[in-house]
Amino acid sequence: MNREEVTDLIVTQKVKKKLTWAQLAEVVGHSKEWSTAALLGQMTLTEAQAKAIGTTLDLPEEAVTQLQVVPYKGSLPTAVPTDPLIYRFYELISVYGTTFKSLIHEEFGDGIMSAIDFNMDLTREADPKGDRVRITMSGKFLPYKTY
């Protein structure tokens, strides 16, 4: 059983058991954002976390073991995404990526925002014109070194 098959099984069991990502995050013991990334194959669970998820979702031992293996991160297809929601993020980076880069460099200097030392929070924001999605990302600034 590979990581993609484990992810498919997790999603199937989540739907079958009528669980939310937030409920599964409580089992994992981390934020819903990090836990969802882990359960979708992008992070590594500890043995205790993997066993707890395995019990909650009735996963086979092989899947529980696979959840403890460091995944190949960023393993989404490299083509332009076709899923409408994921494409909007692609579009957002295409339009605002140079703005993010310019403003971060102006504020912090030459470097990058870490996706390793990173936090994310996703919430619903009530709006009379239609609810909005609020995503807050916080990554440590890592300056490039000269040598």
Swiss-Prot record:
The alphabetized UniProt keywords are: Lyase
**Catalysed reactions, semicolon-separated:** cyanate + hydrogencarbonate + 3 H(+) = NH4(+) + 2 CO2
Function description: Catalyzes the reaction of cyanate with bicarbonate to produce ammonia and carbon dioxide.
Active-site residues, Swiss-Prot/TrEMBL = 88, 91, 114
Could you list the residue ranges that cross the membrane? none
Q: Which family does it belong to?
A: Belongs to the cyanase family.
Q: Which Pfam families match?
A: Cyanate_lyase, CYNS_N
HAMAP family in the record = Cyanate_hydrat (MF_00535)
UniProt GO BP = cyanate metabolic process
Q: Which SMART domains match?
A: Cyanate_lyase (SM01116)
Q: Per its record, how is this protein called by name?
A: Cyanate hydratase
Q: InterPro entries this protein is in?
A: Cyanase, Cyanate_lyase_C, Cyanate_lyase_C_sf, CYNS_N, Lambda_DNA-bd_dom_sf
What GO terms are given for molecular function? cyanate hydratase activity; DNA binding
State which gene encodes it. cynS
What domain of life is recorded for the organism? Bacteria
Q: What is its EC number?
A: 4.2.1.104
Enumerate the PANTHER family for this protein.
CYANATE HYDRATASE (PTHR34186:SF2)
